[in-house]
Every structure is written in C-alpha cells, then in structure tokens.
Regions:
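An alpha-helical interface "stripe"
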Residues: 91, 99-108
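Context-gated lysine
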Residues: 9, 25, 48, 57, ...
C-alpha cells in the first residue's frame, strides 16, 4: 500500500529514561566472552543517540522534527502538567544550539543533576507518553510519521505499581488510535521485553511484528540499532 505521507516531514520524540539505574555503568561481554566495563552510562548512551540523531537530521532531513523528553527526573523542567518529567529539547527542527546543548550533558555528568535535580523513581510512564502526545498535537502543519522512541535499561519500570502499569497500557492503546508509533530500544544485557514493554508496544501497534533485538551493550551497537529503526518507514494501512 502506498504511503501518502512519505514526503512530509517526520516527527520523532526520543523518550529517555533518566531514573537511577540509567546512571550506573554496566558491563558488557568482550569478544573473548569475558565481561568488561562499559565507558558510558545508559543515560549517556541515550543522550549520545539523541546527539547523533540531530546531527544526521541536519544533513539528511532538515525539515524533520526531533524532541527529547526525560522521565524519572527529580524536578519537572519545561513540563508544567506532570511531575518527574522534563523536556531536554523541544520538538523542533535540528539546530546547532540543540546539538551543543546535548554535548554539555555528554561532557559533564554533573550537568544532569544541576539542571534536573537528579533522578526519581516516582514517575508515571503513561504521563511521559501523554506529554509526547501533547507535543505531537501542537505541531503546525502536516507530518508524515509521528514516532516515540523510548530508550531504557529498566525492563519493568512499574513492577510494584500495578495502577501505573494499567495506565501505561491504556495510554499505549490510545497511541494506536491516534497513529503515533512507539518503539522501545533496550540498553544493556539481560533486558526482558516480556516483563512489561512487549505488551506495551503491541498495544500501541497491533499491525507490525515486535522488534525484539537484544539490549545494546555498547554505544556503537546502540547507535546502529537506533539509526536503523529511525529510518524505518511504516506503511500506512490504517484509516485514521
């Protein structure tokens, strides 16, 4: 089926987990099979993905929109309706100042705590998704594909909070009804999609097979995975 929106600008929100586990360096398996320390924390890897994405958009898709939302921050910065959710970058075309802002967080790990107050586990994922929906709704003009790419190393964020889990699943169904795609990219080894995110993604998109690529342990692997998924176009088969 033809995708009549393929020539329009796309909109992408990188929804990055900023909770405490994201700021702890993990270990990865070396080529010899031995474990070795990874130089970047999962959060730094997520910011690096955002940085690489913006640089790519500048040269190859300057009309596309990219934003970065954090969930699991102590403060709510740039977001007025929800607690523990912050806007790192607005949903806008890629600009040099946005790239430089991301570099500040990559160059100085203290920048995160200074600006967002540190991490908090008392967030609601459905509110983070809701914030993304609101940003898409405020876009002026038509867009092609609207996508949320969620990056996290935590495979069951609401393990002890059943109501929050139910709310997240309901919000995922809402994404399905509004044509917003949700893609979850795991970071680190041992990530089990079937604990939580498998159901979430399938509720958000019941027409395409779930990508169950194992969690990326190194930044080069994560960049390769995210680059492929960002560029992947979905055929338009649903009537909205």
């Amino acid at each position: 089926m033809l995708d009549y929106r393929s020539s329009a600008k796309d909109a992408l929100i990188l929804l990055c987990d900023a909770s405490s586990p994201m700021h702890v360096k993990q270990e990865a398996c070396s080529e010899s099979g031995e474990e070795e320390s990874v130089s970047m924390t999962p959060f730094e890897m997520a910011v690096k993905v955002a940085h690489a994405t913006l640089r790519n958009k500048v040269f190859h898709a300057p009309n596309d929109l990219v934003g970065v939302i954090l969930f699991g921050t102590t403060e709510a910065v740039g977001v007025s309706d929800f607690k523990h959710i912050s806007q790192l970058l607005p949903l806008d075309t890629a600009e040099a100042q946005h790239i430089l802002r991301l570099e500040e967080f990559l160059d100085d790990a203290r920048k995160f705590k200074e600006e967002f107050g540190g991490s908090s586990g008392d967030f609601s994922l459905h509110e983070a998704i809701w914030q993304c929906q609101s940003m898409f709704a405020n876009i002026k003009g038509k867009t092609g594909q609207n996508k949320i790419m969620l990056l996290t190393c935590v495979d069951d964020p609401h393990a002890s909070a059943a109501p929050k889990k139910r709310h997240a699943m309901a919000k995922a169904t809402d994404l399905n009804n509004t044509g917003i795609y949700l893609d979850v990219v795991p970071i680190g080894k041992g990530f089990k999609m079937d604990k939580f995110y498998k159901d979430l993604v399938q509720l958000a998109d019941d027409e395409h097979p779930l990508d169950e690529t194992p969690g990326a342990e190194r930044i080069e692997d994560l960049l390769r995975v995210t680059r492929k998924r960002i560029h992947k176009k979905r055929s338009i088969g649903r009537v909205r």
